[in-house]
Amino acid sequence: MLLALAQWLQNDYSFLRVVNYLTFRAVMANLTALVIGLAAGPWVIRKLTELKVGQAVRTIGPQTHLVKSGTPTMGGVLVLVSIAISTVLWCDWGNRFIWVVMLVTLGYGAIGWVDDYRKVVYRDPRGMSSREKFFWQTLIGLVAAVYLAFSVSESSNVRVWDLFLSWVEGGLSLDMPYKSNLIVPFFKEVSYPLGVAGFIVLTYLVIVGSSNAVNLTDGLDGLVIMPVVLVGGALGAFAYVMGSSVYSKYLLFPHIPGAGELLIFCSAMAGAGLAFLWFNAHPAQVFMGDVGALALGGALGTVAVIVRQEIVLFVMGGIFVVETVSVMLQVTWFKITKRRYGEGRRLFRMAPLHHHFELSGWKETQVTVRFWIVTMLLVLIGLSTLKLR
C-alpha cells in the first residue's frame, strides 16, 4: 500500500523514491511488525486473561510446568496480526507470491484458532480431531501446491494459467521448466526434475510437515519462536537472491521473478516473532497456541518451496525435524513393544525431545537456549549454501 502511495507521490516528493528499494521496505516491515507487537502485546494479554483463555497443563509432564496452568494462550493471534498489517503496508500488492504465503499462513492460523478455541472455551482438551485438522491442512496445502507447481517458473498469473491448461490438455503430462527442479545444496547446478505430480506431492509434504513440526516444537517458553525468526530471516535472504536476476545468476541459482518480495513477509515475520518473544520469554506471560505455531510453520514451508530451498529448510529447521522424529519414534516403538511384550516401552523419557531433556535434569531455560544455539549453527550452514556450491 505504501509502495503504491510513494510511487504516486514521488514526482513531487523525491525522498519517497527510497520506498522503491526492497531492502528499505524489508527493514521497515520488520520494524513495523516489531512495534505493533510490542505496543499491542500488553492489551492482547490483558484481553486473553479477561476472557480466561488459559492454557491447561498436563499433569503427566514435567512438574515444573504446573505453575504455568492458566497462562493465557492463543497469543499467536498477536503474531499473525502484526505480520499481516506490516506486510500489507510495505509489500507490492501485485505480487502473487505474497498472497499465496499470506493465505496459507492465515488459513493455517484459522485451523489453529478453531483448535485452541475448542480447547480453552469449550474445555475440550482434544480440540479439533486429528482427522478434521488433517483434512483442512491437506485442503489448504494441496491448493497452494497446485498453484505453486505452475507459478514458480512463470512471471505472471496469465502464464500460470496457460501452463496449467497445457498440463490438462496434455493428459496431465508436462515437462516442467528447470526452475521447478529440486535444488541440491552444496552442489553446483545439481537439481532433480520433479514433474507436476512430484512437485505437488513434495510441496504438500513440506507445507503440512513444516506446520506440524513447528507446532510440536512449541512446548517451552520461547523455545519455538526464536528458531522461527532465524529460519524465516534466512529464507528471506534466499528470497532476495532468487528474486534478483543479478544475484541469482552470480550465485548460480534459478531466477524466480517476484520471489524477492517475500523478503518483506519474512522480515515482518521476524519482527513480529521478536515482539512475541518479549512476552513469551521465561516465565511466559502468554503462549502462542496452535493459532500461531501451525501458521508460522506453514509460512516457512511455503516460502521454502517458492525459493526452491526445501532441502535447506530441512537443514536449518533441524530442531523442528528432530522434535517431530522423536514423537514418531516414541509412538512407533511404544506400539511395537506393546504388541511384542504386552506393554509399551519408551525410547525417550517423554516426547517431544525437549521434554526428554527436561526430565533428564536440564532446566527449561537451558533446553530453550541450547536449542536456539543449535538452530543458529544450522541456519549458518544453510546460508553457507548460497556460496559454497
From Swiss-Prot:
It is a multi-pass membrane protein. It catalyses: UDP-N-acetyl-alpha-D-muramoyl-L-alanyl-gamma-D-glutamyl-meso-2,6-diaminopimeloyl-D-alanyl-D-alanine + di-trans,octa-cis-undecaprenyl phosphate = di-trans,octa-cis-undecaprenyl diphospho-N-acetyl-alpha-D-muramoyl-L-alanyl-D-glutamyl-meso-2,6-diaminopimeloyl-D-alanyl-D-alanine + UMP. Its cofactor is Mg(2+). Its EC number is 2.7.8.13. It is found in: Cell inner membrane. One of its GO terms (biological process) is cell wall organization. Pfam families: Glycos_transf_4, MraY_sig1. Keywords: Cell cycle, Cell division, Cell inner membrane, Cell membrane, Cell shape, Cell wall biogenesis/degradation, Magnesium, Membrane, Metal-binding, Peptidoglycan synthesis, Transferase, Transmembrane, Transmembrane helix. CDD domains: GT_MraY (cd06852). Pathway: Cell wall biogenesis; peptidoglycan biosynthesis. InterPro entries: Glycosyl_transferase_4, PNAcMuramoyl-5peptid_Trfase, PNAcMuramoyl-5peptid_Trfase_CS. GO terms for molecular function: metal ion binding; phospho-N-acetylmuramoyl-pentapeptide-transferase activity; UDP-N-acetylmuramoyl-L-alanyl-D-glutamyl-meso-2,6-diaminopimelyl-D-alanyl-D-alanine:undecaprenyl-phosphate transferase activity. The keyword Cell membrane applies. The chain crosses the membrane at residues 25-45, 74-94, 97-117, 134-154, 190-210, 222-242, 259-279, 286-306, 311-331, 366-386. GO terms for cellular component: plasma membrane. PANTHER family: PHOSPHO-N-ACETYLMURAMOYL-PENTAPEPTIDE-TRANSFERASE (PTHR22926), PHOSPHO-N-ACETYLMURAMOYL-PENTAPEPTIDE-TRANSFERASE HOMOLOG (PTHR22926:SF5). Catalyzes the initial step of the lipid cycle reactions in the biosynthesis of the cell wall peptidoglycan: transfers peptidoglycan precursor phospho-MurNAc-pentapeptide from UDP-MurNAc-pentapeptide onto the lipid carrier undecaprenyl phosphate, yielding undecaprenyl-pyrophosphoryl-MurNAc-pentapeptide, known as lipid I. Belongs to the glycosyltransferase 4 family. MraY subfamily. This is Phospho-N-acetylmuramoyl-pentapeptide-transferase.
